[in-house]
C-alpha cells in the first residue's frame, strides 16, 4: 500500500459538519423549469402542491434563490448518528490498477439503510411531523429509500406506507423485512390496492413494475388518506437540497488536505446522490471560480440522459403527478428488470437535466455485466461489497483511472459510493453463476415511448 500524508480515511469532526444545505439553483443562470399542472398546463405554486407534499418541503422545492438553507438542529442531531461519513483514499484500488491517478470515494453506507437516502428521509419526516401529520407514503426501488424512511418515521413516530417495485420486492425480501421491522407496511407495486395499480396490472399482468408505477400508487394513497402526504427519495429539488450534505462534507475534507479533484463521478437514476455529491463543486463552476469534469453514470437498460429527450413529462407512470421538464424516456417506459433497482427510473432530476442540457456535465451509460465486473474488482481490493447502483460510479472511476495509466496523467478522481450491496446477493449470485444478461432497449422501443410525451406549451 502507498504511504502518503493523506490518511486512508478522512473523517471530519462533528463540529465540522455542515449547518446549512446548499441550494445549487441559486447559482444557476438557467433555472430548472417549474413543475406544471397537467390539467391546466400552467406552473404549479404552493397551493397546487399542498395536497401532495408537506408545506415546508414545498417552500424548499420552489426556492430557486436562497443559496444556503439552515438545517434544523433536530435533523443535525439525527445526522450525528451516522455522519460525518468518511472520504476514503482508494490506495488499494490505485495500486491494483497500477494507475498514477489518485482515487477517492465518499462512502455513504455506514448506516442501517445502507445508503445515502437517510440524509433526506429524516428531513422529510421531520417536516411531516412538524406539520402534525399522521403518516406518509412513498415508493422504493431497491429498498434503500424505503428502509431509510422507515428508520426516520420510527424515530419520529410517523406511520409509513411503502410501495416497493415488484421485481425488487421479489429479489430483495430481506430489505423488505428491515422496513417492516421499523414499522412500515410494504406493498409490491403495481398492486391491487390502488386504482392506478389495478389499471397497470390490467394492461400488463406480468409487469415487473417500475419506480414510476410505485410513485403513482404512493401519491394516490397520500391524496386520498386524511393526515398523509407523499414523500420521495429522489428527482425533485428538495431531495437534492438535503443530499448536498454529501458534497459539502466531501469538499471540506478535500480542502483540509489541499486536494482539488479533476473528475467527480456519481451514479444517476433520479439524481439524488449525484446532485448531492456535485452540488458545492458545481456551484464553484457556475460562479466561474473553478472547473471540474462531472460524469453521470446510468444503466444502459434505462438511459435517461444518454438516449432520452429534454422535455416535460409525468414523474410517474399513472400520470397523476405534476409534469417536470427533464431528460426522460417517457413515463410509460418500463425498463428491464436489471439489478440496480434504484436506477430504474424513466426520468432525471430537473436540476441535473438543466445542467446537462447546458453542457456543464457529461453522462455515459454502462451495461450491468460490466458494472458487476467493476463491483467484484472493487470488493476484492477495497474490502467493501458495493451496491449495484454505486457500482456504476465505480465502473466509470476505474475506466478513468485506466485512461490515466495510458497517458501517465495524475488526475484526482472522486466518486460517490452510495451504499452497500449486502441485500443484493441475488444479483451477485447471477453474476457469479454467469447467468446475468444485458437487456438494452431498442431505438424503436424508446421512440414509441417518447412519442407519447404530453404536449406542453413553453
Predicted features and spans:
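Active-site-proximal loop->helix
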Residues: 137, 145-208, 304-316, 424-433
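A short, small-residue-rich loop immediately preceding and capping a beta-strand
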Residues: 120, 128-167, 260-274, 294, ...
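Buried hydrophobic positions in well-ordered alpha/beta secondary-structure cores of metabolic enzymes
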Residues: 86, 105, 117, 124, ...
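Alpha-helix C-terminal capping segments
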Residues: 123-133, 147-159, 180-181, 278-288, ...
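Active-site/ligand-binding loops adjacent to catalytic centers
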Residues: 68-70, 200-238, 246, 258, ...
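Claisen-condensing/thiolase-fold acyl-transfer catalytic domains that form or cleave C-C bonds
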Residues: 268-276, 368-433
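Active-site nucleophile and cofactor-binding loops and adjacent substrate-binding regions
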Residues: 107-118, 136-145, 239, 265-270, ...
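Positively charged, low-complexity intrinsically disordered leader regions
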Residues: 3-133
